[in-house]
């Protein structure tokens, strides 16, 4: 089995979360639905219908898994959101778009119907868009094979489910209500009670087309009864787009909608007529013309189901179809059946139970998508929209006092998901009950449906009620009479599942009659069924009137349970009803906000329930009692206070630890969690009885809900200060909490952040342990997943609130940490032997320095913690480090040599992290120059080689960044001041040390030279400082020592520095020449050019190219300087000013070795880099102007070929003219070169092409030059 990586959450429902995911080891992205196990029937249905369907308009199923807590469905990822979102955003769509979308819908639906599948619940939220705009049917939870009973299918799957289901919600409605979809798109015949059909799907399709065009469905009302009446009785209005500027609907479209929205299914469009409709403009011309309702429908004989046995036949394994080689296009209804649901399971039952960790939550940021994949019927997903603002730039504004912080934290301890209430009665997690059925034939009164009962007139209702009471009150003289009464009670069980009906029955005389029969009925079967009816009425009623005798029923039930306490079966019948009644009273009292004497629950009821929790009872009884406590303690009422005793916590904990059924364990810890909400001592009693370690170990549970409730309990404990000192000192506890940050559950991660915040508030030292356990990484990951705004999902919103508070606290804590470090260092400043108290303070504070490093390297914290105050404090710490390094202060004896060195290293590393973001230096330039750079400069003199190198590297990189920054908005003056301070600092403190620094082993000279490069590049004054500091000889000495590794960092810095010095107008060139500039440049240029011309080593070519360009730049500056001096001397000679030309002659003599470079410069001319050609040709031109053709190899055969190639390939007249002038100067100054040219056939031909009269289009300035050269050689 393969694991999956989960990225961001892209959809959410009440019981389902949808993630964008990726199969580990591949680049295939998928949608992964994580759903509670209570949705097993729906998910199983989806899988059995779609697992072999491959169609462009149907979301592809890949595979499914079952883990300890959830079902996981892996399907095709659709990145365009849902059709519901599109309609909501655009309000209405143009008719052309409706046609395009409609073609996709019809293609997909037609394919499903050909397979014998009815979608049954077509709505915009179940239609997804792929990136290019293709519509796809998704969420087949309520789809079915034509003719089957989906309710029975669900019941069969649910019956096969084991007791270890860990989903958080138990079904609140019956199977019948569970298989109902959205009524807005339901066909009239289905509303009346008929089964779904092809025709009803086509009605829904018509509603969808109508809504796309007009922006609203054809029938809509907030009231279900009003909506039903509209669907059954009214005709839809013609569709009108919301945007009045858009064209009205065409006659073809109106005709199409009229055909699809016929109330009589016999008159509705069939597939044949639909595909041939003119609205589609022959888009389905190639479709199967035999497609008709009759062809598509499956025989009722084949699919008929009359009872549970037939329902099992409907569940037949689709592998049989594969074995028989089923033909494409043939109705496949029978192929979706399962003979035995255990043969059709997600991956886990065959391979052993899987752990939730197979779905790993990614910590890598990914762009959000707006994919929407919805699951449960009736569930509205909250879809993520693309991020508009990055949460990483979110700053927690303002200072939050600890009182305000803890106040906000207390509000976050309990969430809605901690207080979910599920039914006590008919709860399949507690005990699976057979479906309640009644026989209408022996029911001696009208068999009204729930919908019919809702619309009965008062007189009819009273008549109905009288008949019911009469039959219940009748004596049971025979077995038949008893069966009839039981049948009637079964009927009441069915209708009591509806809220309005239950409310009316509870407040009718029937309720008093039921209590009476519960007390006196001789038949215990009837008593049990009466109790069941009472429980269902209590569970579903919406209001409770004060005169309703619920307390009488509670007292009676308590007495019956107490009198028959050894009868476990009887307790199992009566306890759920007792619990529902107490919970009903508690909720009503909470609504009324003050206790009612008439609703006071007797103490005996609490006593009975506590007895039912004890060891030795059957687990079902334990579970029922725990569920009652869980529900009642969700409320703030007098009833919940009755359960708060000294023994309740340990009893529930015993159930949690010793039960084998996960559902009971979850209920027990959930009940404990809710009791602790009223009285934290309940959990305190648990810790004192079983020990803190045992309780902490329960956080490692594989059940997500248990982890969630345990985190809630610990947060509640910490908020009250109970066991505070023990918990905040327990490193194992902190490590366990941080491990929970890997959970795929948003709620668990949020609560883990909240618990950590409580710990960090009271124990700052745990921040270091948390950072070492990757807390900052977890914060960054979840910060990417939380975006501010209304569109934020509830789970992410909760996570965002917890994260914001944690980030706010850590940001506010950092200055305190730095303050403590500064105080501890200030107290020992200048002392060789710190006192015991000072040693203790150092040991406590200095180890927290890594926290600073963790925060400044975080993109979440860095913008918030790096402030002017922070940099000032940091600079002060560096000053203390300087004192420690120089020996003025001794902390080695206090904390140890290793700890001292680690402290210094981390401090320097923190600034290294800051300078990776130059904007921070720009904002606080003066603070950096005035408070951080001086101690860094002092550390360059350190005796410790590591600190000397580290500080020099930081100084070099910081200086480079500072001098490269540009300032505006009135900051120029501050910039000038800081520049002068920086210059003075380097001049007075650093440059005097360079004599030793430059002669140290690598890489020290490289960083030292890099600083000089940055300063000389942007500050001409600094060039004079370099010369005055007598660094020039040292620079050339470094050159000699490192010339063997010319591509190394040191030589690159040397060449860059020489380039700056030579290019500076104020530079003392005579000093450079005296120190051997010419010979050094000749050597360096020769070696670098050789590397560039080596065709066999491309790596060296690429590395040497920038270096070569710098050296050529230096050469060009030298030659330009020389030619300028020579020109001035010639001008003086012509004018007869009498100036001595000796200086110019000496300079020419000094530069004469540069003529050896001519034979290197010519091969560089064909270089692919135009800049190298440009500077090489300029250098060559000046050299031949100054020295003519002195180099004997200037026009060697190889060089002649290069000139010939260049004159042929270069098209720019300026470049041609420059090359020709170089040639002319060579041949006119050296007879040997003239002779060489006479024999150069290729070069002569190139010159002939450029000469006048050759038929070429040579430039007017180029042609005479070419002709002049040809004439000189006799052509």
Curated annotation (Swiss-Prot):
It catalyses: L-seryl-[protein] + ATP = O-phospho-L-seryl-[protein] + ADP + H(+); L-threonyl-[protein] + ATP = O-phospho-L-threonyl-[protein] + ADP + H(+). One of its GO terms (biological process) is microtubule cytoskeleton organization. Residues 299-350, 364-392 are annotated as: Disordered. Residues 336-348 have a biased composition (Basic and acidic residues). Its EC number is 2.7.11.1. InterPro entries: ARM-like (IPR011989), ARM-type_fold (IPR016024), HEAT_ULK4_RUNKEL (IPR056981), Kinase-like_dom_sf (IPR011009), Prot_kinase_dom (IPR000719), ULK4 (IPR045906). This is Serine/threonine-protein kinase ULK4. The keyword Lyase does not apply. It comes from Homo sapiens (Human). May be involved in the remodeling of cytoskeletal components, such as alpha-tubulin, and in this way regulates neurite branching and elongation, as well as cell motility. The gene is ULK4. HEAT repeats lie at residues 842-880, 926-964, 1025-1063, 1151-1189, 1213-1253. Residues 4-280 form the Protein kinase domain. The protein kinase domain is predicted to be catalytically inactive. GO terms for molecular function: ATP binding; protein serine kinase activity; protein serine/threonine kinase activity.
């Amino acid at each position: 089995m393969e694991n999956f990586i989960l990225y961001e959450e892209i959809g959410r429902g009440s019981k389902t979360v949808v993630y964008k995911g990726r199969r580990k080891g591949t680049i295939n992205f998928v949608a992964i639905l994580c759903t509670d196990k209570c949705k097993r029937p729906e998910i199983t249905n989806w899988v059995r219908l779609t697992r072999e369907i491959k169609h462009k308009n149907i979301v592809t199923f890949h595979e499914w898994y079952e883990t300890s807590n959830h079902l996981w469905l892996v399907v095709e990822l659709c990145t365009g959101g849902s059709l519901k979102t599109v309609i909501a955003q655009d309000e209405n769509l143009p008719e052309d778009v409706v046609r395009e979308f409609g073609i996709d819908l019809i293609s997909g639906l037609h394919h499903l119907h050909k397979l014998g599948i009815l979608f049954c619940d077509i709505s915009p939220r179940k239609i997804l868009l792929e990136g290019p705009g293709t519509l796809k049917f998704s969420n087949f939870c309520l789809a079915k094979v034509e003719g089957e009973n989906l309710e029975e299918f669900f019941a069969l799957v649910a019956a096969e489910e084991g007791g270890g289901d860990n989903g958080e919600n138990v079904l609140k409605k019956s199977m019948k209500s569970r298989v109902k979809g959205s009524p807005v798109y339901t066909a009239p015949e289905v509303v009346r009670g008929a089964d779904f059909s092809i025709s009803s799907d086509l009605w829904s399709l018509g509603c969808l087309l109508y809504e796309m065009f007009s922006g609203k469905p054809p029938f809509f009302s907030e009231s279900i009864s009003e909506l039903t009446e509209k669907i059954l009785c009214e005709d839809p209005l013609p569709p009108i787009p919301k945007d009045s500027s858009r064209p009205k609907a065409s006659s073809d479209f109106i005709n199409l909608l009229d055909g699809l929205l016929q109330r009589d299914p016999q008159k509705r469009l069939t597939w044949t007529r639909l595909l041939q409709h003119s609205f589609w403009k022959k888009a389905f011309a190639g479709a199967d013309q035999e497609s008709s309702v009759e062809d598509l429908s499956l025989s009722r004989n084949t699919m008929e189901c009359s009872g549970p046995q037939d329902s099992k036949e409907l569940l037949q394994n689709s592998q049989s179809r594969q074995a028989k080689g089923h033909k494409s296009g043939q109705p496949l209804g029978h192929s979706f059946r399962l003979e035995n649901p255990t043969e059709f399971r997600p991956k886990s039952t065959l391979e052993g139970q899987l752990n939730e960790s197979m779905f790993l939550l990614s910590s890598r940021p990914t762009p959000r998508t707006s994919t929407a994949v919805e699951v449960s019927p009736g569930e509205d997903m909250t879809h993520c929209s693309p991020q508009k603002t990055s949460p990483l730039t979110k700053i927690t504004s303002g200072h939050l006092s600890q009182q305000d912080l803890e106040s906000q934290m207390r509000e976050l301890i309990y969430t809605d998901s901690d207080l979910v209430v599920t039914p006590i009665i008919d709860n399949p997690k507690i005990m699976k009950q057979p479906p309640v059925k009644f026989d209408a034939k022996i029911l001696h009164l009208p068999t009204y449906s729930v919908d019919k009962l809702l619309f009965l007139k008062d007189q009819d209702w009273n008549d109905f009620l009288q008949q019911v009471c009469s039959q219940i009150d009748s004596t049971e003289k025979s077995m038949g009479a008893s069966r009839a009464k039981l049948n009637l009670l079964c009927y009441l069980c069915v209708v009591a599942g509806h809220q309005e009906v239950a409310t009316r029955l509870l407040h009718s005389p029937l309720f008093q009659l039921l209590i009476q029969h519960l007390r006196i009925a001789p038949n215990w079967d009837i008593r049990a069924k009466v109790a069941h009816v009472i429980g269902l009425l209590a569970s579903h009623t919406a209001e409770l009137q004060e005169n309703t005798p619920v307390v009488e029923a509670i007292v009676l039930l308590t007495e019956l349970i107490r009198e028959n306490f050894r009868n476990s079966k009887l307790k199992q019948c009566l306890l759920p009803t007792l619990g529902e009644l107490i919970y009903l009273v508690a909720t009503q009292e909470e609504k009324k906000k003050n206790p009612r004497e008439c609703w006071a629950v007797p103490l005996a009821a609490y006593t009975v329930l506590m007895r039912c929790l004890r060891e030795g009872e059957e687990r079902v009884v334990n579970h029922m009692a725990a569920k009652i406590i869980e529900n009642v303690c969700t409320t703030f009422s007098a009833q919940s206070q009755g359960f708060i005793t000294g023994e309740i916590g340990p009893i529930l904990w015993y159930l949690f630890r010793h039960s084998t059924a996960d559902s009971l364990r979850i209920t027990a810890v959930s009940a404990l969690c809710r009791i602790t909400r009223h009285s934290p001592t309940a959990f305190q009693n648990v810790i004192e009885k079983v020990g803190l370690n045992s309780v902490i170990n329960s956080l490692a549970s594989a059940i997500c809900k248990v982890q969630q409730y345990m985190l809630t309990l610990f947060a509640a404990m910490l908020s009250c200060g109970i066991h505070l000192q023990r918990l905040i000192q327990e490193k194992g506890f902190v490590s366990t909490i941080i491990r929970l940050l890997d959970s795929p559950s948003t709620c668990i991660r949020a609560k883990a952040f909240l618990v950590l915040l409580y710990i960090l508030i009271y124990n700052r030292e745990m921040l270091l342990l948390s950072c070492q356990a990757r807390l900052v990484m977890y914060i960054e990951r979840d910060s990417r997943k939380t975006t501010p705004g209304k569109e934020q999902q509830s789970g992410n919103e909760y996570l965002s609130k917890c994260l914001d508070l944690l980030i706010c606290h850590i940001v506010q804590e950092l200055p305190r940490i730095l303050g403590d470090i500064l105080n501890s260092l200030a107290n020992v400043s200048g002392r060789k032997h710190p006192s015991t108290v000072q040693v203790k303070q150092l040991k406590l504070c200095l180890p927290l320095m890594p926290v600073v490093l963790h925060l400044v390297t975080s993109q979440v914290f860095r913008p918030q913690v790096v402030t002017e105050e922070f940099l000032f404090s940091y600079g002060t710490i560096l000053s203390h480090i300087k004192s420690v390094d120089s020996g003025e202060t001794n902390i080695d004896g206090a904390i140890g040599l290793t700890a001292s060195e680690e402290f210094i290293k981390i401090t320097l590393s923190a600034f290294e992290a800051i300078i990776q973001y130059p904007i921070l230096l720009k904002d606080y330039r003066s603070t950096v120059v005035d408070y951080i750079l001086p101690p860094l400069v002092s550390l360059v003199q350190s005796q410790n080689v590591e600190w000397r190198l580290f500080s020099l590297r930081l100084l070099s990189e910081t200086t480079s960044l500072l001098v490269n920054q540009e300032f505006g908005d009135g900051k120029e003056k501050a910039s000038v001041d800081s520049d002068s301070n920086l210059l003075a600092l380097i001049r007075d403190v650093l440059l005097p040390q360079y004599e030793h620094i430059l002669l140290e082993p690598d890489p020290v000279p490289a960083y030292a030279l890099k600083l000089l490069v940055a300063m000389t590049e942007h500050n001409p004054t600094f060039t004079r400082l370099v010369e005055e500091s007598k660094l020039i000889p040292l620079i050339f000495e470094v050159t000699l020592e490192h010339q063997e590794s010319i591509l190394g960092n040191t030589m690159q810095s040397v060449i860059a520095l020489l380039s700056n010095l030579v290019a500076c107008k104020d530079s003392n060139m005579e000093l450079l020449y005296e120190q051997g500039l010419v010979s050094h440049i000749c050597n360096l240029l020769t070696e670098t050019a050789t590397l560039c011309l080596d065709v066999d080593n491309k790596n060296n070519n690429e590395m040497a190219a920038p270096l070569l360009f710098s050296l050529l730049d230096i050469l060009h500056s030298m030659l330009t300087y020389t030619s300028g001096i020579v020109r001035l001397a010639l001008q003086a000679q012509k004018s007869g000013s009498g100036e001595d030309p000796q200086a110019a002659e000496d300079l020419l003599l000094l530069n004469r070795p540069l003529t050896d470079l001519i034979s290197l410069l010519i091969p560089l001319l064909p270089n692919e880099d135009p800049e190298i050609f440009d500077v090489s040709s300029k250098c060559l031109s000046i050299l031949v102007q100054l020295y003519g053709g002195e180099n004997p190899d200037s026009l060697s055969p190889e060089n002649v070929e290069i000139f010939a190639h260049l004159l042929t390939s270069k098209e720019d007249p300026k470049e041609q003219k420059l090359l020709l002038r170089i040639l002319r100067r060579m041949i006119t100054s050296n007879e040997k070169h003239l002779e060489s040219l006479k024999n150069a056939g290729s070069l002569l031909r190139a010159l002939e092409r450029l000469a006048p009269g050759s038929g070429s289009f040579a430039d007017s300035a180029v042609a005479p030059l070419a002709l002049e050269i040809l004439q000189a050689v006799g052509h």
